[in-house]
Amino acid sequence: MIDDSIVRGTQLRETTEFLYRNGAKEVHIRPACPPLLYGCKYLNFSRSKSEMDLITRRVIAKREGENVSDKVLADYADPNSANYKEMLEEIRKELNFTSLKFHRLDDLKASIGISPCKLCTYCWDGKE
């Protein structure tokens, strides 16, 4: 199943439960964007009021505590890091997905065709 993003995880958790109740054997999730690690400072695209509403931040808080440095968050944003892979596995388990794979931010930037200096990526990497 493809969705635009996973913010809190509520909607996909409910959809996944519905699919399993109605006979699905597996549920594979492919969000259209990288994991959201920061709440948007610029647009009100979500009902989330706190970064702790984000499923990524809740998983990180379970692993690291709530006060996490920017350096640690950058490691979780790096799709080549062990922390990133473990975060995805925790999200997959928590939401009962068979598999979960996100787009990489570097691939997303390349595919858009806009100069990276004109593209806001704050919610994914915390960079303004």
Regions found by a protein language model. Give the residues of each.
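PRPP-associated nucleotide enzymes
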Residues: 1-128
